[in-house]
Amino acid sequence: MAVTANVGTIFPVVWAGDRVQLIDQTRLPEQYELREITTAAEMATAIRTMIVRGAPAIGVAAAFGMVLGAREYRGSDREGFLIHLENIASQLRQTRPTAVNLFWAIDRLLAAAQQPTPTLEELQQHLLETAQTIAREDVQTCQAIGKNGLGVLPKTPEKLRLLTHCNAGALATAGYGTALGVVRAAWAAGRLERLYADETRPRLQGAKLTAWECVQEGIPVTLIADTMAAHCMQRGMIDAVVVGADRIALNGDTANKIGTYSVALAAKAHNIPFFVAAPLSTIDTSIATGAEIPIEERHPQEIYQVGFSRITPAGVDFYNPAFDVTPAHLISGIITELGVFAPVDLARGIGAVSG
């Protein structure tokens, strides 16, 4: 039976004393369940199996995974501790190759580990405080993205009908959400008539997670199959599209959940603005274009099996990329915590605002 009762404010990754509590997103919407993670290896498994997912949330989870790994060290010398921490970082880096926030958070923890402290215990505490700061900053970042996104949405009609793909909500971040942060801001401002959510095959994050989040807060949501998005645009049912991102190249090319590119093409064909909402940490300044973004491929079972039932005949081959890359020319604006940038101005813009 689906969970429909309000579970309160959604925080998918929480430090709880000496462990991490994760909302098990593989169980939603049928069951709201918290998983307790006590080791770095357990965190790596949780990220790989998508118990926790969404680029910013993965980053926060990886940061706490580093903290758990640091607490597993049984030696007493700092050099051995740093080697141990590098090994933990290597394990976590191998979990999901596309989401750049994962690598950003791990690198931030490794940098924090260079902080001179009198004892290893104090260094471990410093790592925990750094991870908690990442989580806290992410919520604040998402709220700023929501505010900035609200400001760039079409001025007419007064009540907007927005479309989103996958889940870029509270479940995909430390809380509030990126694309759904914009939706939440529009709803709070009285500017949202309805959210249309693509179901997002093959893992159905839109159907299972985005719809669930909306139900928790009473946001009017209509679920559609991925193949219906262009039809809805053609019928004049969509005023703007807002999606999240897992990695953005310097030229604005954006990797997001598979199917996003198709939505962007349809939006362009119907002159509907298509926005990407993401924190600056999702922008990979080391790559020039989307051609350099590694695309994760997942097990074909996600395609051929629904629940416990196989839906395809034996002998069929499968191709299951988890992400696609939307070219920058299809994107109307990239909504960040520090403002909204046209893709062509992204590199110059982030340089200006970051000093």
Curated annotation (Swiss-Prot):
Q: Which Gene3D superfamilies match?
A: translation initiation factor eif-2b, domain 1 (1.20.120.420), Translation initiation factor eif-2b, domain 2 (3.40.50.10470)
- In the record, what terms sit under GO molecular function? S-methyl-5-thioribose-1-phosphate isomerase activity
Site description Transition state stabilizer, residues in chain:
166
GO BP term, example? L-methionine salvage from methylthioadenosine
Listed transmembrane segments: none
- What's one Pfam family here? IF-2B
Q: Which domain of life is it from?
A: Bacteria
Keywords, ordered alphabetically:
Amino-acid biosynthesis, Isomerase, Methionine biosynthesis
Q: Does the keyword field hold Isomerase?
A: yes
Please name the catalytic residues of this protein: 246 (proton donor)
Q: Which PANTHER family match?
A: METHYLTHIORIBOSE-1-PHOSPHATE ISOMERASE (PTHR43475:SF1)
Under Enzyme Commission nomenclature, its number is 5.3.1.23
Q: In which pathway does it act?
A: Amino-acid biosynthesis; L-methionine biosynthesis via salvage pathway; L-methionine from S-methyl-5-thio-alpha-D-ribose 1-phosphate: step 1/6
State the encoding gene. Answer: mtnA
So what does this one do? Catalyzes the interconversion of methylthioribose-1-phosphate (MTR-1-P) into methylthioribulose-1-phosphate (MTRu-1-P).
Q: Which HAMAP family match?
A: Salvage_MtnA
Q: Which family does it belong to?
A: Belongs to the eIF-2B alpha/beta/delta subunits family. MtnA subfamily.
Q: Any idea what this protein is called?
A: Methylthioribose-1-phosphate isomerase
Catalyses:
5-(methylsulfanyl)-alpha-D-ribose 1-phosphate = 5-(methylsulfanyl)-D-ribulose 1-phosphate
Q: Which residues bind substrate?
A: 53-55, 96, 205, 256-257
